[in-house]
Amino acid sequence: MTIANLIDHTALKPHTQKSEIKKLIEEAKAYQFASVCVNPTWVEFAAEELKGTEIDVCTVIGFPLGANTTETKAFETKDAIAKGATEVDMVINIAALKDGNDDFVEADIRAVVEAAKGKALVKVIIETCLLTDEEKERACRLAVAAGADFVKTSTGFSTGGATAEDIALMRKTVGPDIGVKASGGIRTKEDVETMISNGATRIGASAGVSIVSGAEGKNEDNY
């Protein structure tokens, strides 16, 4: 297992063009990243390009705000899987969590887990930069209760990204059997090593190539 094998090689900007997605895929093949993480519109293309490889196709659900209806998130999940996605990163309903509506948050996550039906890993983005520590812990517990495979720090589209402290808190909360994905602002090999040492088992980054090559990450994206 190498650092590259832990990275979801990511391109989620709304103006990302086909040539850039093609480059992302070729880089994933060259460096053997865990997955490519793309917007839903690119899932079918990525799945076709990655056919015959062990690289997963990851996409995002209810992204980046998490404010879609539960029914929409479930449909997005089924549609993405039908088009070739093998991993989905969903955003929780952040407002519901802050309102203390835990039953709704858990049901929202569970709907995506059930829509995936063992065909795709489900990673739950809790958007740590918007939460108190108590809310982070509660979100993690709800994700575990709903049957998610991973908890994830950030979308990369809000006010902050992954921190070592948040990764450690999330790992402590979910225990050893659930994955923890760090994303948002990870640009160097040292960043990755810090996240892993605090409990991360997957890294989301658009600077994957510079991370594994040891070059200084110059990508200005937040994910």
UniProtKB/Swiss-Prot annotation:
UniProt xrefs under Gene3D superfamilies: Aldolase class I
EC number: 4.1.2.4
Keyword list, A-Z: Cytoplasm, Lyase, Schiff base
Cited InterPro entries: Aldolase_TIM (IPR013785), DeoC (IPR011343), DeoC/FbaB/LacD_aldolase (IPR002915), DeoC_typeI (IPR028581)
CDD domains, alphabetized: DeoC (cd00959)
Coiled-coil ranges from the UniProt annotation: none
UniProt catalytic activity: 2-deoxy-D-ribose 5-phosphate = D-glyceraldehyde 3-phosphate + acetaldehyde
Main location (coarse class): cytoplasm
Pathway the protein takes part in: Carbohydrate degradation; 2-deoxy-D-ribose 1-phosphate degradation; D-glyceraldehyde 3-phosphate and acetaldehyde from 2-deoxy-alpha-D-ribose 1-phosphate: step 2/2
Any one GO CC term of the record: cytoplasm
GO biological process: 2-deoxyribose 1-phosphate catabolic process; carbohydrate catabolic process; deoxyribonucleotide catabolic process
Enzyme class, first EC level, given as a word: lyase
Catalytic-site annotation from UniProt: 89 (proton donor/acceptor), 152 (schiff-base intermediate with acetaldehyde), 181 (proton donor/acceptor)
Intracellular or extracellular location(s): Cytoplasm
Record GO terms (molecular function): deoxyribose-phosphate aldolase activity
Similarity comment: Belongs to the DeoC/FbaB aldolase family. DeoC type 1 subfamily.
NCBIfam families listed in its UniProt record: deoC (TIGR00126)
Entry function: Catalyzes a reversible aldol reaction between acetaldehyde and D-glyceraldehyde 3-phosphate to generate 2-deoxy-D-ribose 5-phosphate.
Name of the protein: Deoxyribose-phosphate aldolase 2
Species assigned in the record: Bacillus licheniformis (strain ATCC 14580 / DSM 13 / JCM 2505 / CCUG 7422 / NBRC 12200 / NCIMB 9375 / NCTC 10341 / NRRL NRS-1264 / Gibson 46)
Lineage: Bacteria, Bacillati, Bacillota, Bacilli, Bacillales
